[in-house]
Amino acid sequence: MKLLVVSNRLPLTVKKSKDGFEYTKTSGGLVTGLRGISDKIRFMWLGNISGVELDEEEKKVIRKDCWEKFHSIPVFIDPVLNSNSYDGFCNAILWPIIHSFKDDVAFTIKDYNAYVEYNTIFCEEICKIVEDGDIVWVHDYHLMILPEMLRKKSDKSFKIMFFLHAQFPPAEIMETLACRREIVSGMAHSDLIAFHSFDYAINFDDTCRANKVEVRSKLDAIPIGIDPAMFRSALKEEKTVERIKELREMFRGRKILLGVDRTDYIKGMPHRVKGFQRFLEKHPEFLDNVVFLQVGVPSRTSVKEYSSYITKMNELVSETNSKFGSIESVHLYFLNKSVDFNELCALYAVSDMLLVTSLQDGMNLVALEYISCQNENNGVLLLSSNAGASTTLPAAVEVNSWNTEEIADGIHRAITMSLEERTERHEINRKAVDTFTSVEWAEKNLDGLCDDWRESLML
């Protein structure tokens, strides 16, 4: 038995160098989840690594490097096909609909056909290596129709798990998607389909019923976790310790509010900034005592809705600092770039409060990462009730992220919260993060599929 993890992309980027190719590990929710299990569970990873033109000899070198260095199998996709599937269908059509942002979506058959071809290439690569008794673990919305393809193409006897890292919307939202039946039918050929919450599982089942798709799969809710030890270990590294000192000195005497998000419209960053503005209007006594640091990691910038989102954020940042700031004092910093892991952990550690105000969000692991870095500070988590993490972290200060007044009041509540209450809330959330780890998540998925996997896959 072998476990084959299948995702849209390998957790690597590759670029040409003088001596061949350079490989850089990437981050993200799935990567964070699976990196935590790599020393406990044996698996190989299959995913797209292309995006540039490569000749056959270069592909051969990359295949060898990926297997020997990362125990991974690269899938090579033509750049135009990749763009039409990833940007055109996945992120301009499927992503907004599954997060209930359906109004500006226009279905195009060209992009859907690219999605089908993309999944077909994955299917062909998997069929080359899958054997009787194996487990194929398919991840996320980029590969929703892959399970059905595998069942139809392969004559091998293997099990399929599917995990959706995003939301799954109510059936009436899915009704707006022209290919909805193909999508849910594709998923329904899995042995196990797992979601972050039971609400998403119920929505999937309702959509199948509405479209007369038979579901023989086992449906479950298994929220993903992180490896908290990885973050706490980074806090002890000299680079992180020094950066924490620098940040504390830089913002001495001020409460630090933090946001860390991809620049994605589902994350609700403009609503967060407007909530922060409203807080400053209602409580001017805090004007000289707070600073808001917002990290916006660039995401899907080739999709129009995402690039215009950054423009909107820059306008709001300028508006906030013009209205409330001065030559000596800036209230809102917006960093539109990725930060390295040590910098991220330092930001988590020094912040008095993290704002997660997603309008819709499958999970949001940033909330869990923040908790894992707050054992000394007992910072407060302001969390959207529309994020899947709200079911995992019961002691967060929960807000309706569509309501800027509620965000403003939540900020005030967090800033003025007593040390006793902060400590109590943090301890409840810490226990949740330490209990529902990425290893626990993977084990629960595998346990839901079969009983004998430990004998073959545990390291």
From Swiss-Prot:
Which branch of life, at top level? Eukaryota
Quick check: keyword Transferase in the entry?
yes
* Residue numbers binding UDP-alpha-D-glucose: 262, 267, 361-369
**InterPro entries tied to this protein:** Glyco_trans_20
Q: Which GO terms describe its cellular component?
A: cytosol
Q: Does the keyword Cytoplasm apply?
A: yes
Q: Where does UDP bind?
A: 262, 267, 365-369
* Annotated D-glucose 6-phosphate binding sites: 86, 140, 300
- Which chemical reaction does it catalyze? D-glucose 6-phosphate + UDP-alpha-D-glucose = alpha,alpha-trehalose 6-phosphate + UDP + H(+)
Instruction: Please provide the record's keywords in A-Z order.
Output: Cytoplasm, Glycosyltransferase, Stress response, Transferase
GO biological process terms held by the UniProt record? trehalose biosynthetic process
Name its cellular compartments.
Answer: Cytoplasm
This protein's major location comes to cytoplasm
EC numbers listed for it are: 2.4.1.15
Q: What does this protein do?
A: Synthase catalytic subunit of the trehalose synthase complex that catalyzes the production of trehalose from glucose-6-phosphate and UDP-alpha-D-glucose in a two step process. Can function independently of the complex.
How this chain assembles, per its entry, is: Component of the trehalose synthase complex.
**PANTHER family given for it?**
BCDNA.GH08860 (PTHR10788:SF106), TREHALOSE-6-PHOSPHATE SYNTHASE (PTHR10788)
Protein family membership: Belongs to the glycosyltransferase 20 family.
Name listed for the protein in its UniProt record: Alpha,alpha-trehalose-phosphate synthase [UDP-forming]
